[in-house]
Regions:
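Short, basic/glycine-rich phosphate-binding loops at helix/coil junctions
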Residues: 3-6, 60-64
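Metallo-beta-lactamase
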Residues: 1-38, 43, 53, 79-93
Length: 157
């Protein structure tokens, strides 16, 4: 590890104990105001950056259409649903995740909420994340129209 990177957190960090709360509500990005938005679900500390001038939400891993909630640091689908409901109230047109090379329309949030609602009591398929840090869980595929929407959870209900 090079000296400047000693403070970096490796993926799979032991207990994620060295992550702290981001304590700034907004920042100016060269005459463009940005707001920090909490997006818990994928992880407790997930945040997004809302850029009102662009009507865009940068969501990191929190709003991927295949919602991954099966690692030790992931939260429940109930928490994910609350986040989706909050996001639904925001005034944006598109969002960008960290795992895709395209913007998604806000309308996809509705389908993600329906996916969680539909998943209760439905058939899930065994799932195993194929590389370290490996995690097992269950996959529910809700729909495959324009963009596939699904849910991966650690335990079925």
């Amino acid at each position: 590890m090079i000296p400047e990177q000693e403070e970096m957190i490796p993926f799979g960090a032991d207990g994620w104990h060295n992550i702290c709360k981001l304590d700034i509500p907004s920042f100016d990005l060269g005459e463009m105001q940005c707001q920090i938005v909490p997006l818990p679900g994928h992880t407790e500390g997930s945040v997004g950056i809302f850029i009102p001038a662009l009507r865009l939400l940068l969501s990191g891993d929190a709003l991927t259409p295949i919602m991954c909630l099966n690692f030790q640091n992931h939260l429940t689908k109930e928490v994910q649903m609350k986040t989706l409901q909050c996001v639904q109230q925001m005034d944006f047109d598109y969002y960008l995740t960290s795992h895709h090379d395209k913007c998604f329309p806000k309308a996809l949030i509705d389908r993600m909420m329906k996916c969680i609602e539909h998943s209760y009591g439905k058939k899930h398929y065994a799932y195993r994340y194929p590389q370290p840090p490996y995690a097992e869980g269950y996959f529910y595929l809700d729909s495959v129209e324009e963009e596939a929407v699904g849910l991966i959870v650690a335990e079925m209900d």
